Amino acid sequence: MNYKLIANYIGNILRIEGLFMIPALLVSLYHNEFKCVLAFGISIAALLVIGQLMYMIKPKKRNIFVREGFAIVSLSWLAISLFGALPFFISREIPNFIDCFFETVSGFTTTGSSILSNVEALSKGLLYWRSFSHWLGGMGVLVFLLAVVPNGKDNDAQSLYILRAESPGPTFGKLVSKMRQTAQILYIIYIALTIIEIILLFAGGMPLFDSVLNSFATAGTGGFGIKNASIGAYDSYYLQGVIAVFMLLFGVNFNIYYLLLARDFKLVFKNEELRFYIITVLMSVTVIAINIRSMFSSWFDAFHHSFFQVSSIITTTGFSTTDFSLWPELSRYILVVLMLMGACAGSTGGGLKVSRVLILFKALRNEMQRVVHPRSVKVLRIDGKVQNEALVRNVSMYLVAYVIVMIASTLLVSIDDFSFTTNVTAVISCMNNIGPGIDIVGPMGNFSGFSWFSKLVLSADMIIGRLEIFPVLALFSPSLWKRCN
């Protein structure tokens, strides 16, 4: 293990986080929030000084392999969450550091779970930092580092280990030959979609500050609301419709947008994950709308709220226009299934990912056919390409690890003596980076009632879910920390 290289990378990440806090400081300054200006000033100084000291640790070798990639990604996410919590704590707007840490982890992992009962009481600068953390975490902080910091020829291929460890989904490949160019393309698409959404929301009458922050949360599929009633506070079909559409767009694999820009429409239409994603959304919206029709004054309202909540849950954004905890059992069951499945691989969304579900369905179908026809030879194809058994095995092992972590976490948080539904959906929402669960942690509730221990467990679940389990679990493997000769 190259410890100096890990320290060097984390130091660079902390310096970048310090620079990213400057806009939040300026927002606080503009609104005369001098307590928050001081909090951000101290936090920025700490990040820049500590980050620079760590960055000055120069490794003899800059080779990044799987072990270094896992360690850099996992420890970087822990570090940015700890330091990102400082403005909340120093300003005393959230007096308990565990709560500050929970809120910040929820922001960077794009979960959107909150301990705040009155978010509108938070200062503008902290609201900005809270939502901006969604935007930074959506594409990945280390992806940004790869996009803007030259790595050199020798380290370009090795940067793939970092990108694979941080990017969601069972597989990740380069869009172009250079790793840095791949990261730049991803961020250009990400920024462009964010700007378009800001313009559309502002054009629809949403205040500019709200448009920017809601777009940050949508882009990262995070769901931190800046109103107590979430998006339901904006009584506008247009604004809610724009956000619903963009939630779905950010839940699509970003490779699709690159293919569209390259005019490779054949590969887009051939993409099975995209088709499965669209069909799942359409079917879920229709069934839920029929199921909740009696709760609304018209079919239009039923379809509107159904479309918004399906978009929000499947992309793991977590915005809400109404309290879906009060919906009939069938609708709530469908939403829980969508929570588990999540968005497409290579998107900013969380969950198991559509591609994994698709692979598991196809593997199950092939296995059933082998039972009926033992001598038959079945291969698993995705987008017309034959997939090897290793991919199926990896997806299966991921599912096993996911279930084990989910069961263990549910047992740990159950000591707070909340209902089974509250405990399970709290863990599911945190592991899948969704935000709201059902019952006490529903869209109109929050996580403040959990003990400090449960909040730490749920914070760990958020990071585990965002980094897709194995990079975090690898930290507890003694072999990861052995020195290389």
Where are these regions (language model features)?
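Membrane-proximal intracellular helices of multi-pass ion channels
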Residues: M1-N485
